Amino acid sequence: DGLKKDNFHITLKRTLHDGIKYYQIEELEEALEGADLILGGVSSFGLDWFCDEILPVLPEDVPLLTVTKGMVDLDDGTLVPYPHIFEQRQPEGKHINFNAIGGPCTSYELADHDDSHVAFCGKDMETLKFIKSLLTTDYYHISLSTDVVGVECAVAMKNAYALGVSLAVGLAEKRDGEIGAVHYNSQAALFGQGVKEMIHLLELIHGGPENIIHGAGDLYVTVFGGRTRKIGTLLGRGLTFDQAMEELQGVTLESIVIATRTARAVRKLAERGVVSLDDFPLLMHVDAIINEGA
């Protein structure tokens, strides 16, 4: 209702641009009328709701582009990106054209029309070209890929590793006794280790190695701000996971979900002899902090 009144977004703390129409969820049918493209932007915690309540009413002849980043781990250690989960959970007999966005692009800077580069991925290149033609601007730059697993898993992983890199921020603040203290050497060391482990994970899921550009870029921008940096910093200062979560009460933390699922998948693969846990020291350390009280 506030957006309808004055275009002011209370979370972004910005007045959005003219030409945008706003609808309540009860007005979904009206909003879909004449649409050329549908964008889905729920958090990973809204995945079940989106699958159960929204997918059944979406038209099949309009492509869907989702910004939800995440993976689900299966019993054998396989990591499945959300676009594949959406596809599996659409109503029987329905064939929605699923596509997704990956890459470093914060909502705040996009709202300010800051230059950004992302990847659109999906099964059909012609559909991707059509979507790109609708959304490309002089500040929003788009690459296309049919490697959905590679793109989406790369950008999902970064949430876990951004938490790991942010530990160095909290460690610096604890050592110096100063909030905002910065030590780039330690952050860079963890960043490099994170990218190394992400490359290894991409190999395991058979994602193209070229997709690391999207994951590494997303890792970079996530470390510099946002919810994941906050939780990593608090943990680095020495707070327990429960203490840190209490301080951030009400904040959605997808990094916790991704770190837990990815570590669990790696452990299962290690049990099968596919990988060694020694190849993922940063991921295992993050998992130990958030799930084992380390």
Predicted feature residues:
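Conserved residues at beta->alpha junctions
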Residues: 41-42, 122, 290
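Short, small-residue-enriched loops and turns at beta-alpha junctions
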Residues: 71-74, 151-152, 221, 251
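NAD(P)-dependent Rossmann-like dehydrogenase/reductase catalytic/cofactor-binding core
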Residues: 16, 158, 163-169, 173, ...
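Glycine-rich anion/phosphate-binding loops
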Residues: 44-48, 142-148, 286
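Glycine-rich phosphate-binding loop and adjoining beta1-alpha1-beta2 segment
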Residues: 1-16
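Rossmann-like NAD(P)(H) cofactor-binding subdomain of soluble oxidoreductases
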Residues: 16-115, 131
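Internal alpha-helical scaffold of NAD(P)-dependent oxidoreductase catalytic cores
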Residues: 57, 89-97, 115-210
